UniProtKB/Swiss-Prot annotation:
Protein name, as recorded: O-acetyltransferase OatA
Family assignment from sequence similarity: Belongs to the acyltransferase 3 family.
Superkingdom of origin: Bacteria
Upper taxonomic lineage: Bacteria, Bacillati, Bacillota, Bacilli, Bacillales
Molecular function terms from GO: acyltransferase activity, transferring groups other than amino-acyl groups
Gene: oatA
Length: 603
């Protein structure tokens, strides 16, 4: 290849800045931040991560094929070096700050934080959280580095994909490469569906590189079909209008999904992520076109400012929200706290972007130096050292003693409360009537209480109030899990005159049919159905089903915990679901009072 040919290829395949993608990044990161602030505000905001994945797949592949077409090779070492300078410094800065903050303000969490930090440093956070059975959608646990799972997937992709694409470009035509990538994306989709069907674990398929590769590969495929360097600026107005209609329509669909999709919706784990990501391809395709008015909309200055800092904003928003929220009861956080979290996120993101990421991206590690003439370099170096020293000591395990008691308490924490099964005594009709009409006999009765971790919380308090109660509470239990248990173990309670308390729904949504099946399994027993208080997007839907069941069924009585607990943050632990002693006592008293009221009304 002579110099003339090289210059022609250089001009033809030269990569260009794509401001429209920064604008799309802005919407994605805003959605993610709102979701983590309060999932009830934007239940599908977590889909912003998938938008990032598709963009990453598209951009990285575009850069790689552009380089290959220009030079007939891909400099892998240079590619990895650029990724290193772009991603790692900001993550290390974040981890050092989080470890230092934990050491000073949350020392009891130091062991957990050390383990999470090590996983984050080596970009294996997603597999680490899978191995620890971490629930991604449990926003109430103090896990400030949990959001780094997505960066782990991207870094794993950046490490391996260039090797694969280099091999494919040398041996196959673009059409064959597209077919190969499409098949692999379908395999990834199939793995998500199969693993989810077998395990029923949303977090396993959400965290897994194997099950999330589908989204990245769709972006890669688009880069071959619609490379940015091949798009012409001079096109007819009709084509421009058509492109904008496609872009705006796709964008409207994505934004709608941000509002209506929930993290417990099962369809998204059974092909939904693939469909949503496929729809995102149309937005990206128009966002990168040089003639699109929609691309110009995405290129507005405010969106570009946010989009260029989207990586920094993503890094910092989650630990700030987690740490600040840990001092409040979830679901009862004052509005000013959210404002503080947003401001802190913007501040730390700007510090990271301006003083860590940009200097290193431009100058490499020369941005750090002990040169008196360059105060910014000196200050930056001192700051990093001040954060690095305690972080290294934490990672070495020197402060583990501070967290050993907390780790022991976690292991000893009750995950189940179950009283010894009591024999259900059959009563004649006259005895049933007397029992129902006597408040005193409520405390001598033998009701069945079945529930989740909230039931575990009230177990000891309730048995002091009603010693003969049969209690079956288990952490993580969902309503659908309870129905087969009732049918196999508690058939004796499905009789008129028996009393049953049902407290379920904090761990996930259920349908009207599922609730009816559970209630039907108790026959004509008096059922006391407890409404839920859980700061999740499904709270209102579940309570509506509970209220409707209590209204329509003569044997179902409402225990309105949602109403009774309003304005009582002292009832709850940090997560806004589990109960402190005051809450356990209040819920116990409410259940007993509801039983007594029902007994009185039957006179």
């Amino acid at each position: 290849m002579d110099t003339k040919d090289f210059k022609r290829l250089e001009k033809m395949y030269s990569p260009r800045y794509l401001p429209g993608l920064d604008g799309l990044r802005a919407f994605a990161v805003i959605g993610i931040i709102i979701y983590h602030l309060n999932a009830q505000w934007l239940s599908g905001g977590f889909l912003g991560v998938d938008t990032f994945f598709v963009i990453s797949g598209y951009l990285i592949t575009s850069l790689l094929i552009s380089e290959y077409y220009r030079t007939q090779k891909i400099d892998l070492l240079e590619f990895w070096k650029r990724r290193l300078k772009r991603l790692i410094p900001a993550v290390l800065f974040l981890i050092c700050v989080v470890l230092t903050f934990t050491l000073i303000f949350k020392p009891e969490l130091i062991i957990q934080m050390k383990r999470d930090a090590i996983a984050a440093i080596f970009y294996v956070s997603n597999w680490w959280y899978i191995s620890q059975n971490v629930d991604y959608f449990n926003q109430f646990a103090i896990e400030p580095l949990k959001h780094l799972w997505s960066l782990a997937i991207e870094e794993q992709f950046y490490l391996l994909f260039p090797l694969v694409i280099t091999f494919l470009l040398h041996r196959f035509k673009p059409r064959n490469i597209i077919q190969t990538l499409f098949i692999v994306s379908l395999i990834s989709l199939g793995l998500m569906i199969v693993i989810h069907f077998i395990t029923g674990d949303n977090s396993r398929v959400y965290f897994g590189t194997d099950t999330r590769l589908q989204t990245l590969l769709l972006g890669c495929i688009l880069a071959f079909i619609w490379p940015p360097f091949a798009l012409k600026k001079d096109i007819s107005k009709k084509i421009v209008v058509s492109l904008d209609i496609i872009g705006i329509s796709g964008f409207a669909v994505l934004m709608t999904l941000f509002f209506i999709v929930g993290d417990q919706d099962q369809w998204i784990y059974n092909g939904g992520f693939y469909i949503i990501s496929f729809a995102t391809l149309f937005i990206i395709a128009i966002a990168v076109h040089p003639s699109s008015l929609f691309a110009k909309f995405l290129s507005m200055k405010p969106l570009l400012i946010i989009g260029k800092r989207s990586y920094s904003l993503y890094l910092w928003h989650y630990p700030i929200i987690v740490f600040v929220n840990s001092y409040y009861v979830q679901g009862q956080i004052p509005v000013y706290v959210y404002i503080i979290e947003i401001l802190l996120t913007a501040l730390m993101a700007e510090i990271s972007y301006r003083f860590i990421e940009t200097p290193i991206r431009k100058k490499g590690f020369k941005a750090f130096a002990f040169l008196p003439k360059k105060k910014s370099q000196f200050a930056r170096t001192v700051l990093v050292i001040l954060l690095l020293i305690p972080s290294i000591i934490v990672l070495s395990g020197q402060f583990d003693a501070l967290g050993k008691q907390h780790e022991a308490e976690k292991k000893e924490k009750k995950t189940e409360f179950k009283t010894t099964k009591k024999k259900v005594v059959k009563k004649d009709k006259q005895e049933d009537k007397q029992t129902a009409n006597s408040k005193e006999d409520i405390k001598k009765s033998s009701p069945l209480l079945i529930g989740d971790s909230v039931m575990v919380d009230i177990g000891n308090v309730f048995t002091k109030k009603i010693p003969n109660a049969q209690i079956d509470g288990k952490v993580g239990r969902q309503l659908v899990d309870a129905t087969p248990i009732v049918k196999s173990q508690y058939k004796d309670y499905a009789k008129k005159g028996q009393k049953v308390v049902v407290e379920l729904g904090t761990n996930g949504a259920f349908t009207k049919d599922q609730l009816n099946e559970l209630l039907d399994s108790f026959g004509k027993a008096d059922i006391y159905l407890v409404s839920i208080r859980v700061p999740r997007d499904y709270e209102g839907r579940i309570n509506k089903l509970i209220y409707e069941a209590a209204e329509k069924r003569s044997n179902v009585h409402l225990v309105d915990w949602y109403k009774a607990s309003a304005g009582h943050p002292e009832y709850f632990a940090y997560d806004g679901i589990h109960l402190e002693y005051a809450g356990s006592k209040a819920l116990t008293d409410l259940i007993v009072k509801t039983m007594e009221t029902h007994a009185t009304n039957k006179k």
